[in-house]
A protein has these predicted regions:
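Conserved beta-strand
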Residues: 25-28, 37-58, 86
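Helical segment within the ABC ATPase nucleotide-binding domain
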Residues: 201-215
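ABC ATPase nucleotide-binding domain signature region
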Residues: 59, 74-139
């Protein structure tokens, strides 16, 4: 029996190409529609030509500056925004059209604060009902009691907390607990740990890693907080201007930079900021503005080198392209393998 458990856990090691496909994004393009339900004339896509595939056991860290498109991508994956059915598949089904994914808990999205709409006012307020944490958590039906008890312990929840008196961090713990009660297969996290203290956050990340390694779940986690994340993700996705800039296993990212993960991402964002400043200057001077990062780069193969020597957001100082990475004709599409 013990040997069977070991084989089961190892079968969900992150990065295995033979693991089941959990998330597949193919040439995703998205623009928020106008009041007529159509994209405004002349509008540029907010998300454009975005493709990646995640397998069972993958833990993907989604990074990028404010406004890069991270939340929009997660909402599309969570079935909250409609795109063509074949653009986004969760376990082979359309994230938006197959409502059974979310109703069953197989696909779970956690992001933002608990809020409710104010009728006719056009805005929302945080949920602060006079109700206990126990009633909220135990009010979710169809839950494995052992899983519920483990989550209460991991998140250090006091069941006597009253939601109208609880702190932001305490309410956040209850929100996360309720979102994880059902055994998800794909979990989308949008800056969900922002209110948690260091201890609870560390215990939660450990629990989520176990979910991937033991049950074969896949997680995409967007955050700007890097405490405890140095070795947590299996893959890094860097997004800028709604486009995929980099998608690599964590070991490959570490090979490209000798800095910490946080400092590496900081370098990408600083270079992106500098590129944005240069574009604005060129535009103000009446010069042409480069549209994309890698399209005009003569550098091929290694994605890190493309980001380095091309006119690109996310340049890494630790990589330099050699003569073997150049080609006579321009390479417009770059395929990044796992």
């Amino acid at each position: 029996m013990e040997e069977e458990v070991v084989r089961s856990e190892s079968s969900f090691a992150a990065g295995r190409a033979d693991a089941p496909v959990m998330v597949q994004i193919r040439n995703l393009q998205f623009t928020y529609p106008g009041i007529d339900g159509r994209s405004p004339p002349g509008s540029r896509p907010l998300i454009d030509d975005f493709s990646l595939t995640l397998h069972a056991g993958d833990r993907c860290l989604l990074v990028g500056s404010n406004g890069a498109g991270k939340t929009t991508i997660l909402k599309i994956l969570g079935g909250k925004l409609m795109v063509d059915p074949d653009m986004v598949l969760i376990m082979g089904s359309s994230a938006f059209h197959d409502t059974g994914l979310t109703s069953s808990g197989v696909l779970s999205y956690l992001g933002g604060e608990w809020k409710r709409d104010i009728a006719f006012a056009g805005f929302e307020v945080s949920i602060q009902m006079d109700i206990s944490a126990e009633k909220m958590i135990y009010g979710v039906s169809g839950v494995d009691p052992r899983r519920r008890d483990e989550l209460i312990k991991v998140l250090d929840i006091d069941l006597s907390w009253r939601m109208h008196k609880a702190s932001d961090g305490q309410r956040r713990r209850v929100q996360i607990c309720m979102g994880l009660l059902r055994s998800f297969k794909v979990l989308l996290l949008d800056e969900i740990t922002v209110d948690l203290d260091v201890l609870v956050r560390a215990d939660l990340l450990k629990y989520l890693r176990k979910e991937c390694e033991e049950r074969g779940a896949a997680i995409i986690y967007a955050t700007h907080i890097f405490d405890g994340l140095e070795d947590w993700p299996s893959h890094i996705v860097y997004v800028a201007h709604g486009k995929l800039q980099l998608f690599l296993p964590l070991p490959k990212v570490k090979e490209m930079s000798n800095l910490s993960l946080m400092r590496t991402v900081e370098c990408w964002l600083r270079k992106e900021k500098e590129d944005r400043r240069i574009r604005q200057q060129r535009k103000g001077s009446g010069l042409s503005v480069f549209e994309t990062a890698a399209d005009d780069s003569p550098v091929i193969e290694a994605p890190g080198r493309i980001l380095n020597n091309g006119w690109a957001a996310g340049r890494l100082h630790s990589t330099v392209a050699g003569p073997n990475n150049y080609k006579g004709t321009l390479m417009y599409k770059v395929k990044i393998s796992r």
